[in-house]
Amino acid sequence: MASANQAAKAEAKKVIEKVAKEVIKETKNSAQRNQGPGKRWNSKKGRHMPKNNNNKGMKRTVDNEVKQKLKKEGLEGPRSRFSVRVSATIGKIGPNKEQGPELQIATFLHPSLMKEPNDGTNFGPLQAAAAQWGLWRLSSLEVKCTPLVGSSAVTGSIYRMSLNLTQSPGNASWGGLGARKHKDIPAGKSVSWKLQRGDLAGPRQTWWMTDTNEEGGQSCGPMLEIHGLGKTSSTYQSQDWTGDLFIVEVLGRWEFTNYNAKPALGTLDRKSEDYASDATGPGIMVGDDGVMKMTLPTASSLARFMSDASERSPVNEGSVGETIWHIVDEGAGLASSVAPTPFSWLIKGAWWFVKKLAGRSGANADEQYVVYASLADAQNNKPVMANRFDHTKKATTLTVTQVNSPNTGPGVTQAAYHTENPFPLVPATQPPPPRSIVVVNATARPFGYVKYNTGDSNVKSHGKFDGTQYHFTLKRGSTVSYASAAYILTDVSMLTYEGNRVTGCYDPGWMEPTGITVHYRNESSAFGRVLAYEIDQWGSTSDNHFTIGVWLVQTIKDLPAHDTTVWPYIPLPYVSAGNCTAPPVQVALDKACVPYLTKVGVTSHQQCTVRQPQVRSGTFMLVYSIGTNTPATTAGFTTGQPLGEATNASALPEGKISTSGFWERALSAVAPYQDFISVKFTLPQGPHADPRVDALLDLIQQRFNLKPVDASESEDEDEDSPSGSEEEPCGEEPTPPQPTPRLKLAKEMMYEALRDSDWTHVDAEALLAAISSKN
């Protein structure tokens, strides 16, 4: 970029000199011709003679001729079609905390980025013009530094404004800053610095491109930097000065040409945040991969500002976003103490570029951002490679500017600018981004109630059948979990949150499946698909823990209403002795349990009847389990059976912090017929295979008799009939069936079936491979 700009200037200079010589020569010859021989005595002017204005006229003529020649040669590019004169505040200059040069302000002069930090996406006249025109340039610029404190109140510091034309940081020594075009600012004095078009000219015949997604050297424009030298002290007190010293404003005339509307360029934002302590501050790290990364606390406002919401599409785990962020370490916290070699100069320069790295190790982990040394490197995905450096956090002040917008067109689901109430929220017809925090709100009613007779019941069913049969089985591959209860949801809505901000409204029907299927009891065909899950453990010791698993499910087939017989359980605090007619009821204050439930007058575990309602395909459900099992290593699953003992009791520690909002409902035995419910989920890192494919394969297998029928399934209907038996549940798992000759010949039968069905558009080999893997 620099070489092209210099070449253009050199060519323009040659043309100007050539034109000037020709014009001067022609003007002199014309003057000599007009001067007659009889007037030569008047060549020496006395004091009484009027001054000759030929020099002024010659200068005016030269200027006009040069301008015409430059326009004819096309060295100034297209003419300006629109201009706007704007005064903008770009920030404040604070005190220097150390002796060395410290960066106070670094901002591009691009019209979309000329705004005060934390000004939001305010749509001023300059931003409106940037959103409509394809080329811009500055015809003039004046930088004003207005003091906020008198010169007698502070001492020890001087500041320097300089112009950086390279769009990349460097080793900022005080002498190096003086080698640029610059202006010094004494403390307490008002300073004005005027720059002309030649100082700010762009590489395209003095023009810059407006779209910041283009090459950085062609678009973002010059950068104004302000550094301070010397530690700032108070002259009235023997201590450091802590207040601001100057407010910085720019007054410039921006010119535009080549109409090319890109609305998103007018909404680029800029935010600043103070970090008071090292523990909660930003950090720098270099892992084993050698890539330098910046970290921010997840709960910080800058982390929410730089979230996945700024990306064009959801970012997959481990990938890097498209949005480029300009980071300025105004507090000099990182610049003064963090120095990963060999790029220590970059951090000490106090500004760099980052892109968001998707995925994190846990809900409380820091957000990570890949560091780039220049805007061109960020656009070309060339991160900073440095020696391994342990994660180091420091208290500082960061200012973050959104440099580009991957989608420069008008917003589809979220208005960039509006003046009316945004409600009612309209659900987006797309899934929320991975790792989003979503809250599902719905009207809910229990899946069933426990009944020992025809009387009324308000006790929810936590049902278990013989062996490992529960109301629901969750599967993905060979991993299995069990759920004993559920809620049926209606009027379902879903909101995404970042901190205390609502960031989106979504229809759960658009959610990506997690790859986990839900099976009614132990049926082979899937009853539903899991859209989100939350597994939470209370207690951490090997023998004292409770776990709940909550799965948001969308059914994919109908379940008719019917009565079934189960072994009931009931979640409670641990009851030691006593009853409601002979108080007090004695409970263990630190224990919870899910013991057997039985009717009055019976001491052994007795089966009961549960009337299950009809469930239509497409219904949303909350399937859940509670018991003494633990979270599995596979995300979205629990280990073992939740109800495997007589009492399923566990002592629980105090101070449990839960985020799902479901513990109280899971521990409650009594529930109304209908109630409002809210449950919080953290979405997984990425979508999985659609379980409807598995359901289709199951139907194909059943249609062509390619899958043997489990003998235990034919006995389910007999087990569902209430018998009033008081037998103890069988703890042994049924023996799986042995492969039959029919199963072994599945491949040959599938070939014949596909041939007879004329499914010419189906990849038979792929379908057979999938069916063979399922068996």
Swiss-Prot record:
<feature type="compositionally biased region" description="Acidic residues">
    <location>
        <begin position="712"/>
        <end position="731"/>
    </location>
</feature>
<comment type="similarity">
    <text>Belongs to the astroviridae capsid polyprotein family.</text>
</comment>
<keyword id="KW-1142">T=3 icosahedral capsid protein</keyword>
<dbReference type="GO" id="GO:0039617">
    <property type="term" value="C:T=3 icosahedral viral capsid"/>
</dbReference>
<keyword id="KW-0167">Capsid protein</keyword>
<keyword id="KW-1162">Viral penetration into host cytoplasm</keyword>
<feature type="region of interest" description="Disordered">
    <location>
        <begin position="707"/>
        <end position="743"/>
    </location>
</feature>
<dbReference type="GO" id="GO:0075512">
    <property type="term" value="P:clathrin-dependent endocytosis of virus by host cell"/>
</dbReference>
<dbReference type="InterPro" id="IPR048802">
    <property type="entry name" value="SP2_M"/>
</dbReference>
<keyword id="KW-0946">Virion</keyword>
<feature type="site" description="Cleavage">
    <location>
        <begin position="314"/>
        <end position="315"/>
    </location>
</feature>
<dbReference type="InterPro" id="IPR029053">
    <property type="entry name" value="Viral_coat"/>
</dbReference>
<dbReference type="InterPro" id="IPR004337">
    <property type="entry name" value="Astro_capsid_N"/>
</dbReference>
<protein>
    <recommendedName>
        <fullName>Capsid polyprotein VP86</fullName>
    </recommendedName>
</protein>
<dbReference type="Pfam" id="PF20751">
    <property type="entry name" value="SP2_M"/>
</dbReference>
<dbReference type="Pfam" id="PF03115">
    <property type="entry name" value="Astro_capsid_N"/>
</dbReference>
<feature type="region of interest" description="Disordered">
    <location>
        <begin position="25"/>
        <end position="61"/>
    </location>
</feature>
<feature type="region of interest" description="Inner core">
    <location>
        <begin position="72"/>
        <end position="264"/>
    </location>
</feature>
<keyword id="KW-1164">Virus endocytosis by host</keyword>
<keyword id="KW-1160">Virus entry into host cell</keyword>
<feature type="compositionally biased region" description="Basic residues">
    <location>
        <begin position="41"/>
        <end position="50"/>
    </location>
</feature>
<keyword id="KW-1165">Clathrin-mediated endocytosis of virus by host</keyword>
<feature type="region of interest" description="Basic">
    <location>
        <begin position="2"/>
        <end position="71"/>
    </location>
</feature>
<feature type="site" description="Cleavage">
    <location>
        <begin position="364"/>
        <end position="365"/>
    </location>
</feature>
